[in-house]
């Protein structure tokens, strides 16, 4: 904790307010001694968090939330893409998930052809996409390593073991195309749930906890807003009447994407 003249003055005022003796009755040396004892009484949990620690916790939570959203959105898009052509265009579905993920421009710049295989690869394991699931988990682990003392053992174990398992699944999918995609997406969702559960069940309700919550909620709001925007401006063809069969299937998929579908 950095001690400045302003902080010393504030502590002195607080001490004066909590005592029946006026501070003016003490000499400067005695006042300084009172300030020192007051500072020593401050608990470690009351000290200000370093900005870099707060930043790492915030982005750790955002990356974990983003990976979970991408896994659920990919799962929903795969369902929509399997609908009969009479219900819509599969290419539109894959373009919509790129827009929902905020990755449409990066995908176009990569020179990839817009199809199912390329979109899935770009959003899962592409190293040239900083917003892919692989990149999100790697960056989440990097931030977690920087603030391990602010995390509980359960949270770190979830992130670290999840990262190692993701690397194994990546090798398996590279050898076997996208046959294991369903298993991989389910694994990412379970990893995210374990992380959230660890944060909720094991973290002290201090600054570290609230910075992780802020990161998660901001990322969730951002993803949900983009998803709704895409639903209204991209997915539904003009000829389709709102409330029709395609509209129903799309809303059902969106509920799955945001974990809001009831059983």
Regions found by a protein language model. Give the residues of each.
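Alpha-helical transmembrane segments and their helix-helix packing motifs
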Residues: 1-263
């Amino acid at each position: 904790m950095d001690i400045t003249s302003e902080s010393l003055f504030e502590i002195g005022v607080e001490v004066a307010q909590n005592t029946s003796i006026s501070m003016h009755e003490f000499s400067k040396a005695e006042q300084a001694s009172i300030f020192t004892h007051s500072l020593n009484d401050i608990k470690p949990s009351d000290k200000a968090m370093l900005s870099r620690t707060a930043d790492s916790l915030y982005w750790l939570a955002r990356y974990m939330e983003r990976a979970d959203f991408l896994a659920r959105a990919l799962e929903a898009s795969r369902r929509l893409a399997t609908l009969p052509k009479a219900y819509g265009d599969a290419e539109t579905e894959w373009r919509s998930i790129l827009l929902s993920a905020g990755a449409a421009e990066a995908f176009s710049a990569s020179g990839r052809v817009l199809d199912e295989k390329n979109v899935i690869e770009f959003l899962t394991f592409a190293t040239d996409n900083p917003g892919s699931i692989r990149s999100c988990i790697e960056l989440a682990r990097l931030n977690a390593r920087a603030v391990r003392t602010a995390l509980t053992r359960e949270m770190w174990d979830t992130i670290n073991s999840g990262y190692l398992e993701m690397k194994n699944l990546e090798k398996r999918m590279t050898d076997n195309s996208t046959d294991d995609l369903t298993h991989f997406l389910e694994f990412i969702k379970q990893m995210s749930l374990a992380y959230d559960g660890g944060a909720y069940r094991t973290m002290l309700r201090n600054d570290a906890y609230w910075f992780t919550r802020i990161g998660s909620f901001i990322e969730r709001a951002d993803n949900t807003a983009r998803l709704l925007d895409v639903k209204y401006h991209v997915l539904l063809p003009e000829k389709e009447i709102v409330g029709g069969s395609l509209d129903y299937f799309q809303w059902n998929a969106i509920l799955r994407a945001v974990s809001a579908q009831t059983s």
